Amino acid sequence: MSPIPAKVTAIEKRGLQYQVVVEIVPKYRGSFNTIVFGEFKPHSGSLKDGRLNLVYYQNPGLNIGDPFPLWTLH
C-alpha cells in the first residue's frame, strides 16, 4: 500500500450524519474502491476531482486542517 497525502477541508453535521470533505492530491487517478481508510472508516463516500465526500454516523473526531490517513492499494 502507498500513502495518499490528504487533509480535512470541511465538516458539517446534518441531522444524525456528519459530512466530511477531504482533499487529496489532484494527481491521484485511482477510484474510491482502491482507497484504504485508517481508523476513520466512513459509512459511505465518493471521490471526484481530488475531493472525498464522506458520510459518518458518529462524530469522527476530526477538525478542519487535520491530516487524514489514507492509502491506495496500487
PLM features: residue spans?
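Short coil-to-beta-strand transition motifs
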Residues: 1-7
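Short, exposed beta-strand/loop patches in secreted or surface proteins that constitute
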Residues: 9-11, 42-46, 71
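Residue-level recognition of beta-strand microenvironments
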Residues: 11-13, 27
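Short aromatic-glycine-enriched beta-strand elements
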Residues: 15-21
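Acidic, low-complexity, intrinsically disordered interaction modules
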Residues: 21, 26-62
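Short, charged beta-turn/beta-strand-edge "cap" motif at the junction between a beta-strand
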Residues: 58-60, 71-74
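Short coil-to-beta transition motif at edge beta-strands of beta-rich domains
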Residues: 65-68
